[in-house]
């Protein structure tokens, strides 16, 4: 029997615990899972990476991939495509609904796409690429001195290494800069 896991309408660090609890309940008795994101209106990198991790964990003992219904809002689908989410999702889910096919991920001053970290050898390459883009984001968007971004690079490297060493499997990393002037009157970066 297929069990439903609703992806929150606003999927970020604040709604992740709700998602994780639903995932835990649905996966407790085994069976195939359906991650329903059709009503999702927004997802942060935190939510997208969390959804990929759940998909990785939800593969059935028989090897069947979990199901994923994609968001119906065109702008959400477009963002998920630009973020690189579907590159990883195609490997993990049986995807239902129309979604952007393989898009070339272009460099952006506000988005570092979802990037797979699969082995210790990957960490240096992944961190090197992401570090270059992160420095551009942190210095241009947040006005941080490029030298001061080394702490960010070290934290990112440690996080990527922890994926490999402690998770016992691969993982993903993504970074997005947000302009929340309405709420905070400043720019922030969410990792």
Where are these regions (language model features)?
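Short beta-strand/loop segment at the start of cytosolic alpha/beta domains
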Residues: 1-6
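Hydrophobic, Leu/Ile/Phe/Ala-enriched alpha-helical segments that form helix-helix packing faces
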Residues: 23-26, 54-59, 134-141, 156, ...
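Conserved ATP-binding N-box helix of the HATPase_c
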Residues: 52-54, 146-181
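Conserved beta-strand-loop-beta-strand hairpin that lines the nucleotide-binding pocket
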Residues: 72-83, 87, 164-191
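Helix-loop-beta hinge of the Bergerat
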Residues: 105-143
